[in-house]
Amino acid sequence: MLKYLNARVASSPCLLLVVVLLVLTSSTSCSLFGTHKKVSIPPLLPRVNGTREQMIQEVNRLASIKSIHGKLDIQFEDTSFASFGIAEKYRQVDGNLTLQRPGKIFLALQFTIVDIAQMASDGEHFAVAILQGDEKYKRFVKGTNSAVYSRLDRNGDSAPATNSKQKGEKQTVSALSNLRPQHLTDAFMIRPIDLNAGFIYSLSEFFQEEADTRPNKKGSRVMRGYYLLEELSAPKDGETSVLRRFWFDRVDRIRLARLQTFDGRGQIVTDVSYFDEKPIGSGETVSLPSRIELTRPQDQYKISLSYQDPTSVDLNKDWPPQAFVLQNKWQLPEVDLDAEKPKKLTSNQ
């Protein structure tokens, strides 16, 4: 019998392997499976549950704001070299902002109490006046909101800055020369969700590891839960596309934390993050984000905007149409972007 078993084992490598494994596991099972090592992982923050209807209601609450007027701290980052892990952050400037639905904006920018730029849009067309910096930057630019333009040409020699103030001013003007006023309108004045507009809305959850922003938790990492509410186009030929993606933070309560918009190719047009929600308004207050970060990957910039004094912001005031008209009273050289080349229209600008 022993000879028969030995013969079977010798003739079957698979059977031999099984026998060896049985011997090993029977003699070392305790040490093999009893050994363990504790590792630290980011804790999952407590989260609340919500419904699609609740999130749509929150978007439309924010979208109920008709106008905003207030002073801002604005910081601009040029992300042209983001693929190399480099971004240029420019000096903070002061902004005087007026917004009104639908899509109207006026923004005046100052650097150390000097006017450096003004820009406006009536919802269809925009104008930007660059008032400081090198002569190659001083100009009055006009265009159409729904058009896509390449970055303005910055070629040309410039005189070296004689001090740090001049250097900071030149860098800031250079960075702001390609900012378009209509880029800010949807970030502040979110478009409402209309369930009768033919769009499809899909809800899912998402978990993301990120820095812990709670007090006394500097340097820590946490796992934060989100709801993703996606606005999809009506199906056509069996296909649909994402138009907007709303991120809702689930920690403590349901809060709109991020909004992404997409073009027809599925590429991100705008990526807006909302922070530090608090009562905003000089009279009747509304709970709104007090800091907004807007990233435009295709335009290669990021801009951070914070209210200087949330209690002095005017909400829901009616502004006349002329408040959003910018005239070239400085007699700057004019650049008509529509006249230089045919404009390419897109539906997600």
Annotated model-derived regions:
Residues 1-11:
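N-terminal secretory signal peptides that target proteins for export/translocation
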Residues 59-68, 88-90, 98-102, 119-121, ...:
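Edge/loop elements at the starts and ends of beta-strands within beta-rich repeat scaffolds
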Residues 31-34, 177, 191-194, 198-331, ...:
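Gly/Pro-enriched, hydrophobic low-complexity segments
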Residues 102-183:
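An acidic-aromatic
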Residues 30-90, 168-178, 339-349:
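N-terminal leader/targeting segments and the immediate start of mature chains
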Residues 13-27:
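Bacterial N-terminal signal peptides
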Residues 32, 74-126, 132-133, 345-346:
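Post-signal peptide N-terminal segment of secreted/secretory-pathway proteins
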